[in-house]
């Protein structure tokens, strides 16, 4: 009797992994309070990288360029100069 020695090979070629397929989480930058809105002191007004918007009256700038209210009041986004913007907080008249 004959004995057959059969050898089977893979029908699909092995596929290497790709170097793509990752992405960083969104940083949730941008305006956090709208123009004319009432805010309390310490409220974050605008999160940004760099100074896209500058701090105006009663607004401070954090270490990561976040703009925050220094006092309670109303938010006002304004233009100054030809191509710059600033955000200010004005106290509410009582």
From Swiss-Prot:
GO terms for cellular component: cytosolic large ribosomal subunit. Gene3D superfamilies: 2.40.50.100. GO terms for biological process: translation. The N-terminus is cleaved by ribosomal processing cysteine protease Prp. The keyword Amino-acid biosynthesis does not apply. InterPro entries: Ribosomal_bL27, Ribosomal_bL27_CS. GO terms for molecular function: structural constituent of ribosome. Keywords: Ribonucleoprotein, Ribosomal protein. Disruption phenotype: No effect on sporulation at 37 degrees Celsius, however sporulation decreases at 47 degrees Celsius. Part of the 50S ribosomal subunit. NCBIfam families: L27. Belongs to the bacterial ribosomal protein bL27 family. This is Large ribosomal subunit protein bL27. It comes from Bacillus subtilis (strain 168). The gene is rpmA.
